[in-house]
Structure formats: structure tokens, C-alpha cells
């Protein structure tokens, strides 16, 4: 008897193991490791999804002793998880403190985690006899409507290419199917047509001169269905169903590009990485100043991998925010590229996943989760802007794409490149110790482009001069100068909306979210106050909710308010605003950048999304309206993030022949992060910040574990937090430093109170067993409403 080892989709400590199920006779020899099934589970035999982890045979006596249940349904016609992904899940389980089923599900595309059916339809090669027997008068059949024997037969025919398969989800995530025609020239030449049937004669002549397969719709634009059916009945034309790629629009209008001539530093970097493919060398840190041509190096490294018969993954932070990067890779590699990111429609996501699964795509460009793309013969992975916090998933399973890439490189003997102008301190420290190979690009790729001049403007020098303005006189003068020269300006303000908060001047009440400990943000375009955490929204108050005073004032600033001020100061200027609110609609981000790139706007105002990867030769002025926004956040990485952001945004200026200028406004111009950013001095910042990290005992000198507890009742979360503290103190060695428990800086969101504990350690043998004890706390019945998360190397502390 055939047995399958299946892990079920019940993310609990007690069920984090494979269970044995009997494989029905109809599916013996067809079920494979990595396929999904429905199985009865628990006393009530509730049908739930599971993943096959192994197959084995058992004697009839052993099976009777175990009293195994049968698999109820096979969900896939082929494995949706590879052997590599199954190995990867087991390795990640050791560091992300998550259940194996949660890690496996993170590797699957979203549509496979939804409720759907499989729709089967006949392909051209299926005999008429089998078509009539299986489908009768129907054009297609739902897989779920068939008995087990018929399902097994359909699976065999699908594997032979005689049936087509369409995933049809409840929310219509499915294959896009079109009718195409195929011409049988031998039959067509023998068709007899009356001389009076001029349209049929015309259609025959067209088909004789255009015998290649094409969409039926293209014929029906000029000929009636009756005229086409005449040739179908004669056997001269066959109508077939074909899967159509919705992502085809990505490749339209993008001209093919050729490799650029590299400078000596770029060539050295490319050659070092390409030679490492297949030899399992340590990862590379490619540290290149802004404008040094890292992207062209990436392109040529990937070409080197393709030349060796290998595949490649490029990760980009928030890929929907960097359409220029996507276009460059499509221009170089064409339809070998698959795009995987959250900005795609559900249908597009499915199409791209299918391209990768079938081997039609050899290059994957995507955001964080694209690191799990099931590419075969993986040769190189590149993580662009490797310092970005978005590479760490902040929900379960809390993996870091960099650590996943290191494991995949180990499995495939692939090269791994971490690229950045401002590497994370952890990566730079590893390069300093020789754990990573350090490659540097110290000059701009365009020899005529110069590093822009950076000037810091002290806001305090202009106190008393229109204190409500976002703009100091030097910045206004610089904007006016660039507008007069017909050059473009980029302005960054890391806060969206109109004002930070609304306050009553009589009693000091600030309008806050009823679900979260956070002030509401004013949005004048919708005339609402919004919470950017839980989405709560209300109308702008006319009177104070506390004292009923009408003395309401708007404090702080935002991109919308800055936009209004710019429009008033420079009425002749064409201004574009780019933030989360103006780029919600699909394609709107691309449209705004295209508009700016065509010179249809003079000023681009936005949040930090404009700091990354934009390359416009006519941009000669970059202004940062307030460099202090992130400096004072309660996070030990706040200085590092401020330095990185300022350096990145400064790199948008002077990328071609025209000289660039950067103006940074700050209330704290002497802060070391701002001083080093002004001088574009990464190594100086690195040395200074490392001294602080060593003194305070933070990464990269120590590892960190963040534990967050959440509950509707504050007294309950405090009580459980101290229980966790007791477990940690009794389980961990004295060399580990345990901080907390304390309320999180934003202590309440979504009607839940949040407390956190931080563990700092270097070597801790008892870490795993102790944290498993902490996780066991959540399995107790009285803690059913407690939420507890364990985060290895947390990136955010708010």
C-alpha cells in the first residue's frame, strides 16, 4: 500500500509534523512530493489542505495497525513546491521561529492559497472519440465534479498535453484563454467554393497566404462566423484554445538594448561574480556610489549566468516603485524575464508564476517574495539596495530575503551579490571580516557626470520668517534658478497627507484614532482625517471634540500641503506629487514617472519612494524639505536609515552632463548622520556608527531577538509579558541581555495593546529550546486571545 507523509495547514505547535495518509489506488504512481492535497483531519474529519512531504510503502498489516485515513482529493497535477523549496523550509525553520506549513505557504503564489477549481478543456491532439466520451457536448469540465477514477484519467491526459488546464478561483484568478485557428493547407486547397461566394473565396485566399496560427478574433474582424465555420466543417481550419499571457503588455514598446562598455572597476566586479557561478564562493558585497553603474553590472552578470545555461533572480525593494529598473531588464532580456511583485493583477501573477514553473522565464525580477521563485539551474541572485528594511518580512514567517538567498546560493552553488551605495552595517562588517567578498565602484559610470554639491540649510536661521512654510529662502532661490534654466527639480518630504495632526488651541486636544495610539492625519483632497495604521477615517472636525472650541489648527506638514504651497509660490511651474495617496491606482506610479521623464513637469514632489532608482538627466536640483523626520524615532537604526536615505536621494541629481546640486533642510545640521551624508562619506559614517553600536551592544556586534505580545486587555498583555520574561531569565545564560518588557512606541493599534521584549546575545546554546517554551505559552487555552511573535533580527521597533 502506498502512503503519503503530509503536513497539514494547521499552524500550531502540536501539528507541526507530517501525518501518514493512504493514497487511493486511482492516484498510486501519480502523487509526487510537493503536491497539495485535501485530507480529513481531526476527530471531525474536517477537510483541510496539506502538502506531500514524502512517499513510502507499507505492508497491509502495518496499515491496518495504523488505521490510516485516505487522501480525499489531489489538488495539483504536478508539484507546486520543488525539492529545493522543501529543503529551504526545513533550514529556515531553524532561524525564523515559525511553523513549517507557514514557511511552505509563503513560498506559494497567493492564488494557490485561495479557494478555486480546476477547469479542463480538450486540446487539439485529443481524439474525437475521447472528446465525446469525456466531455460529451460540454466545452469544459470542472475537476471537482468528477469521481476519483475520472480525475485520475484526466490527470494522465493533462500530463500528455491532450487536455488544457485552467485554475478558476472564486475571485477569478485564472488562465486567460483565447480561441486561435490553425490551417490545414492540404485540405484548404481542395475545398470547392461557388464563384458567387466572394467572401469565402477571399477568406480562402487569405488563409492560403497566411497559413500561420493566429487568434480567431483577428479573422472575425473581417469575416463572419458563418464564413469561418464553413472552413471548419470542411476540415481546412481547426479552432483550438490557447493560454494567453496577460503580462504581454509589459514587453510592448520597450526597445531592445545592447550591453554598455564597462569601466575597469565595473569589469572587475562582473568578471569576479561570473567566475564564481557554480563554485560556491562567499557572497559578494558590491558597494558602488550612486550613479556608478551598478545596474549595468547586474545586467552583464545575469547575461554571464545565462551564457552558462543558468538562471537568475534580481530582487528590488518595492518593485512597483522602480519601473525604470524593470524596463531595463526587459529591454535586455525580453520575454525571458518574469515580473513578480504585489502590483500585478491576480491574473498577471498567475501568468508570471506559470512562466517560471514551465521554464519559459530564465530571469526573475521581483520584490522580497520573488526570492522563492522556483527557478531551476539557479546561477546568480542579486539583491539591489540590500540595506532596505523591506527585505525583512514583518509578518509570519519573518524571514529576511538576504538569509534565504544565502541558503539558496549554498544549495545551488550559485553566486550571490548584495548591491548598495550605502550597505547595511551588518553587510559592511561581514565584508570587513572577509565573510563577504568586497567589490567597490568608486566613480560614476558617466565620465561627464560629477558628484553633486551638497549643502545643509539650518532651519533655525530662519525662525521668525514665515514659520509655517516648508521652504527656506535658499531653497526657493535654487528652485527659481532651475526653473529659469528649464531644468528639473526633485523635492522629498518623508510624510504624506496635508498635516501631521489637528490640535485644539484652547485645550490642546489632538484628534487621535479610537483604535490606535496615533494622531489622525489630515487629507484635504478627501476632506477626511485618516489613520495610516488601521485605516480608520472621519470627517475633518469643525469644533474640538473635548471643549467644543472652534480654535482648530493644523500642525506639521505633508506632501499635499507642500504641493499647495509650491503651487502658490511658483504658479507657472508644472508640479507632480508622488506618494502612496497619488499612486494607489494601478499604473499611476509609472504614468507619473513617464510624464516627468518626458519633461512634462518641472518639479517632482514626493515621499521616500522618489529616492530610489530614478535616473533623469535633466534633474539638477534635489531638495530634502526636512532631514530630521526619521532621526528621532525610537530605533537604534534611525541614524543609519537617515544617512542612507539622504545619500540615496542626493544621488538623483547631476546624473548626466549638467552639474547637480543638493539642498538639505534640517533643524539639526550638526548631527553626524547629516554631516556624513553631506560629504557623501559612507566610510566615515560606518566607522562612527560602529563605535556607537559597540558601546551600546547592538548589531552587528550582537544578535537580537524581538518578542512582541498583543492583547485586547492591557493588564493581560503585561501579565503574559512578565511570564515570558521569567521563562527567558531561567532558560538563557547570563551573557544574554534581556530588555523589557515595555510598551511599544506605538502602544496600541487595531484595538490591541502591544508590549515588547528584546534579547541581545552573541552565543546562546539554549536560545532555541527557550524560545520554544515561549511559543508553548500561546498554546494554553487561557491564552487563546494572546498574540505572540518572535522576530530574529527585527528591522522595525515602532
Regions found by a protein language model. Give the residues of each.
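Inter-lobe coupling/hinge segments of SF2-like helicase ATPases
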Residues: 257-263, 267, 280-718, 756-757, ...
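A carboxyl-terminal module marker
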Residues: 726, 730-750, 775, 788, ...
Amino acid at each position: 500500500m502506498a502512503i503519503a507523509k503530509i503536513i497539514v495547514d494547521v499552524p500550531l505547535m502540536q501539528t507541526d509534523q507530517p501525518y501518514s495518509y493512504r493514497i487511493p489506488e486511482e492516484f498510486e504512481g501519480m502523487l509526487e512530493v510537493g503536491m497539495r492535497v485535501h485530507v480529513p483531519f481531526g476527530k471531525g474529519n474536517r477537510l483541510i489542505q496539506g502538502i506531500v512531504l514524502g512517499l513510502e510503502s507499507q505492508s497491509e498489516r502495518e496499515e491496518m495497525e495504523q488505521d490510516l485515513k485516505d487522501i480525499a482529493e489531489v489538488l495539483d497535477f504536478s508539484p507546486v513546491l520543488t525539492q529545493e523549496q522543501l529543503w529551504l523550509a526545513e533550514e529556515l525553520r531553524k532561524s525564523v521561529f515559525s511553523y513549517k506549513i507557514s514557511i511552505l505557504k509563503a513560498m506559494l503564489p497567493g492564488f494557490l492559497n485561495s479557494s478555486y477549481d480546476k477547469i479542463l478543456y480538450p486540446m487539439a491532439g485529443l481524439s474525437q472519440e475521447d472528446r465525446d466520451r469525456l466531455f460529451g457536448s460540454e466545452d469544459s469540465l470542472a475537476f471537482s465534479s468528477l469521481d476519483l477514477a475520472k480525475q485520475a484519467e484526466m490527470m494522465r491526459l493533462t500530463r500528455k498535453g491532450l487536455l488544457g488546464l485552467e485554475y478558476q478561483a472564486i475571485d477569478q484568478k485564472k488562465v486567460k484563454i483565447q480561441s486561435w485557428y490553425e490551417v490545414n493547407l492540404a485540405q484548404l486547397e481542395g475545398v470547392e467554393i461557388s464563384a458567387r461566394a466572394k467572401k469565402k473565396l477571399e477568406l480562402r485566399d487569405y488563409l492560403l497566404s497566411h497559413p500561420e496560427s493566429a487568434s480567431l478574433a483577428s479573422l472575425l474582424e473581417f469575416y463572419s462566423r458563418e464564413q469561418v465555420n464553413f472552413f471548419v466543417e470542411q476540415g481546412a481550419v481547426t479552432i483550438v484554445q490557447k493560454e494567453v499571457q496577460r503580462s504581454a503588455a509589459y514587453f510592448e514598446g520597450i526597445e531592445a538594448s545592447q550591453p554598455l562598455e564597462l569601466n575597469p572597476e565595473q569589469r572587475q566586479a562582473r568578471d569576479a561574480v561570473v567566475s564564481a557561478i557554480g563554485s560556491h564562493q562567499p557572497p559578494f558585497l558590491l558597494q558602488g556610489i550612486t550613479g556608478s553603474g551598478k545596474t549595468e553590472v547586474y545586467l552583464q552578470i545575469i547575461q554571464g549566468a545565462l551564457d552558462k545555461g543558468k538562471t537568475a533572480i534580481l530582487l528590488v525593494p518595492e518593485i512597483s516603485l522602480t519601473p525604470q529598473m524593470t524596463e531595463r531588464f526587459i529591454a535586455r532580456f525580453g520575454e525571458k524575464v518574469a515580473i513578480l511583485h504585489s502590483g500585478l493583477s491576480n491574473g498577471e501573477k498567475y501568468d508570471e508564476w506559470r512562466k517560471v514553473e514551465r521554464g519559459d522565464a530564465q530571469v526573475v525580477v521581483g520584490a522580497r517574495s520573488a526570492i522563492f521563485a522556483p527557478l531551476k539551474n539557479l546561477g546568480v541572485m542579486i539583491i539591489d539596495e540590500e540595506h532596505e528594511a523591506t527585505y525583512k518580512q514583518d509578518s509570519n514567517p519573518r524571514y529576511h530575503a538576504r538569509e534565504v538567498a544565502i541558503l539558496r546560493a549554498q544549495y545551488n552553488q550559485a553566486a550571490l551579490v548584495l548591491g548598495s551605495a550605502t550597505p547595511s552595517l551588518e553587510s559592511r562588517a561581514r565584508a570587513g571580516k572577509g565573510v563577504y567578498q568586497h567589490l567597490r565602484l568608486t566613480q560614476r559610470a558617466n565620465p561627464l557626470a560629477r558628484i553633486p554639491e551638497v549643502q545643509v540649510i539650518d532651519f533655525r536661521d530662519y525662525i521668525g520668517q514665515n514659520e509655517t512654510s516648508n521652504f527656506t529662502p535658499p531653497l526657493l532661490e535654487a528652485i527659481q534658478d532651475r526653473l529659469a534654466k528649464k531644468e528639473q527639480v526633485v523635492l522629498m518630504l518623508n510624510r504624506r497627507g496635508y498635516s501631521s495632526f489637528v490640535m485644539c488651541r484652547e485645550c490642546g486636544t489632538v484628534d487621535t484614532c479610537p483604535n490606535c495610539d496615533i494622531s489622525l492625519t489630515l487629507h484635504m483632497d478627501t476632506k477626511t482625517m485618516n489613520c495610516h495604521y488601521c485605516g480608520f477615517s472621519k470627517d475633518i472636525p469643525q469644533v474640538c471634540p473635548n471643549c467644543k472650541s472652534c480654535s482648530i489648527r493644523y500642525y506639521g506638514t505633508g506632501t499635499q500641503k507642500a504641493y499647495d504651497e509650491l503651487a502658490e509660490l511658483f504658479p507657472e511651474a508644472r508640479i507632480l506629487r508622488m506618494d502612496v495617496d497619488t499612486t494607489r491606482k494601478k499604473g499611476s506610479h509609472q504614468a507619473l514617472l513617464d510624464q516627468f521623464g518626458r519633461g512634462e513637469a518641472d518639479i517632482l514632489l514626493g515621499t521616500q519612494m522618489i529616492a530610489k532608482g530614478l535616473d533623469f538627466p535633466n534633474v539638477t536640483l534635489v531638495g530634502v524639505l526636512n532631514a530630521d523626520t526619521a532621526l528621532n524615532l525610537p530605533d537604534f537604526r534611525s541614524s543609519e536609515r537617515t544617512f542612507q536615505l539622504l545619500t540615496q536621494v542626493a544621488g538623483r541629481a547631476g546624473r548626466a552632463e549638467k552639474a547637480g546640486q543638493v539642498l538639505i533642510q534640517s533643524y539639526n545640521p550638526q548631527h553626524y548622520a547629516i554631516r556624513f551624508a553631506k560629504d557623501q562619506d559612507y566610510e566615515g559614517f560606518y566607522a562612527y556608527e560602529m563605535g556607537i553600536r559597540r558601546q551600546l551592544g547592538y548589531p552587528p556586534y550582537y544578535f537580537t531577538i524581538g518578542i512582541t505580545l498583543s492583547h485586547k486587555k492591557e493588564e493581560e498583555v503585561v501579565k503574559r509579558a512578565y511570564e515570558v520574561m521569567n521563562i527567558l531569565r531561567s532558560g538563557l545564560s547570563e551573557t544574554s541581555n534581556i530588555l523589557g518588557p515595555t510598551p511599544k512606541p506605538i502602544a496600541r493599534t487595531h484595538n490591541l495593546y502591544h508590549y515588547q521584549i528584546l534579547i541581545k546575545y552573541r552565543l546562546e546554546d539554549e536560545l532555541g529550546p527557550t524560545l520554544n517554551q515561549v511559543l508553548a505559552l500561546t498554546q494554553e487555552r487561557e491564552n487563546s486571545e494572546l498574540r505572540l511573535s518572535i522576530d530574529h533580527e527585527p528591522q522595525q521597533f515602532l
